[in-house]
Amino acid sequence: EEKRLPLALVTNILGGPCANSLLNVVVREKNGLSYNIEASYTPYSDTGIVAIYFSSENGNTAQCIDLIEGELRKLRTTPLSARQLSMAKKQFIAQLAISSESNEGYMLGAGKSFLTHDDVDTMEQVYAKVRSLTAVQLTEVAEEVFSGMSRLIYK
């Protein structure tokens, strides 16, 4: 439970919907190897899934995977700088604020939270939790989740 929010932020940094996500910059913009690349996190009551999706030409698949693994390694071993962490938190909070404007999306999230945790945080409580996250927390959760112990590749 205490790892859900740090993992959501790490996933957003890695491959969230903005053009400045790590994977988009490294795989798509710098190397021109992918048409699209993104990461998503789906939490469940007792586990969750982090998925990284990319589309590329067949000949670029191995190089894309190598670049992705390099970024995962960096997240596991090198804490974000204070500036990087601050920018990531601000961007994530802005994305949360925009997504909360959808009443349907907000109510679905609140219902899921209530069913799973018997509680619903206000948006201000969520923002405060995001602001309180540390670079060490993000590195620790990245080390646990991206350690390489589990990986499934669909081609």
Regions found by a protein language model. Name each.
Residues E1-N20:
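His/Glu-based metal-binding/catalytic segments typifying zinc-dependent metallopeptidases
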Residues Y35-S40, V136-T139:
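Glycine-rich, charged/polar anion/phosphate-binding loops
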Residues N31-L33:
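Oxyanion-binding "anion nests"
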Residues A8-V10, V27, I52, I68, ...:
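Buried hydrophobic packing residues in well-ordered domains
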Residues G16-A19, E38, T42-S99:
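M16/insulysin-pitrilysin zinc metalloprotease superfamily fold
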Residues A88-K155:
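C-terminal regions of mature proteins
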